[in-house]
Amino acid sequence: MASNGESGQVVVVGVDGSDPSVAALSWAGRYGAATGATVRAVRVWHYPSSAGLPAGKMPESVDAEVEEQMRNELSEAVTKAKPDPSAHIETKIVYGHPAEALIDESRGESLLVVGHRGRGGFSEALTGSIAIHCVNHAACPVVVLRG
């Protein structure tokens, strides 16, 4: 068994606080503990196009309250996932469209892990799921977990 976080592998996990994303983080934590991979829990901050912002662009003045809420949600998801204590978990907030941001974040990494369905709601069902987009476009292997 590899030492915690010393294998050089990074497992990227998409986390939005939904049950499937927490299940994905839990699985990734066990995988990271078993392989020595670092687990990077990623929360994507997405501004809908209706907000009048260019896709994938963060406004110059970031709303600190919203960013703090994102950090709290990510921290809560890590707590709910109850990852193996020997797993090396890091957290990150990125900005952009969820599927594209996760694909970008996982580029050059060992594995991308996502839940089968997140908080995308009806619009996600119409446009295709983030999980399917990741499976079809990520450069690394993708694990999709049901929660």
Range-by-range predicted roles:
Residues 56-60, 109-110:
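Short, hinge-like loop/turn segments at secondary-structure boundaries
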Residues 35-38, 87, 140:
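Short glycine/serine/threonine/alanine-rich loop segments
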Residues 69, 93-97, 117:
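Short beta->alpha linker loops
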Residues 1-7, 20, 79-112:
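Structural beta-alpha unit
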Residues 58-72:
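A short acidic, glycine-rich active-site loop
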Residues 2-57:
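Small/aliphatic-rich secondary-structure junction motif
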Residues 105-147:
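Gly/Ser-rich helix-loop-strand patches that form or flank binding pockets
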Residues 40-42, 90-94, 143:
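General small-molecule cofactor/ligand-binding pocket signal
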